[in-house]
Amino acid sequence: MQAIILAAGMGKRLKELTQDRTKCMVQVNGVALIDRMLHQIERRHLSRIVIVVGYEGEKLMEYIDTLGIRTPIVYVHNPIYDKTNNIYSLALAKDYLCQDDTLLFESDLIFEDSVIDQLLDDPRETLALVDKYKSCLLYTSPSPRD
């Protein structure tokens, strides 16, 4: 099991909070969003963490290197982050996506530790977790073996 984190975006709507850093480096209660997420993932002993970077990518990678994460981290660069979206960033990581079961995260999320455990413990082959307070289209795709 691996994790892919999409962290290439500019976070324009956060204005001055992201002028010189990525959205996932914004701090909430004194902890950067990416710091919290990486430590939550680290406790699950996954095989690797793939992070797609773009805007302020060098700064983000340097910051992550200071966190002491022991799980191997692989970086994928989205050079046209300012013209694309998360689907494009995910496509850039497709080679990794095909190699292992994957937990996919957007880098600016805050969630309880139990959320990852619920995903890992669920017996279904394909699963999506969404915010219950927002309308969305959610479906479970059948297994290719069915």
Name these PLM-found stretches.
Residues 1-18:
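N-terminal nucleotide-binding beta1-loop-alpha1 segment
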Residues 2-5, 31-102:
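Conserved N-terminal catalytic core of the sugar/cofactor nucleotidyltransferase
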Residues 10, 21, 56:
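A generic "binding-loop/recognition-motif" signal
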Residues 17-19, 38-39, 62-65, 115-118:
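Short amphipathic alpha-helical segments
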Residues 23-33:
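Short catalytic helix/loop segments, enriched in acidic residues and glycine
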Residues 105-106:
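Active-site acidic Asp-centered loop
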Residues 112-146:
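Conserved core of the sugar-phosphate nucleotidyltransferase
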